[in-house]
Amino acid sequence: MSFGITKTIPANEGMERVDSLYDGSVEDYEFHMAGKPSKLQVGDYVYTIFQDQIRGRLQIKELKGGATNPKSGKPRTLVFVAAPGERLAEPIPRKGHQGTRYYDGADWPAQ
């Protein structure tokens, strides 16, 4: 198991966004997380959900606090991940959601 968070890729970003995280076309990517993470660390993972399936995971390389949500004015943390990530051959069913949820990686296939 590998601890981390799940983030849903919005439908309007399309499968092209998901593909770019795993095909080598980008070297890093930035996710946003409300507040300051109490459990998350560099080396943990962001598991990406698209169309109600976990598609893969990317390792966290930096957590940068002090950012502000431009709409609400509330604090948030920027979560920088290394790409390309590990893409699943068979996606894992997982309901998409808004925001961030901690995830223990229990469904991730053993290597």
Language-model segments: residues:
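Short, solvent-exposed secondary-structure boundary/capping segments
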Residues: 64-80
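Residue-level detector of short, conserved catalytic/binding motifs and their immediate flanks
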Residues: 44-46, 56
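Short beta-strand-centered aromatic/proline hotspots
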Residues: 55-66
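Compositionally biased, charged N-terminal/linker segments
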Residues: 1-42, 49, 74-77, 85-111
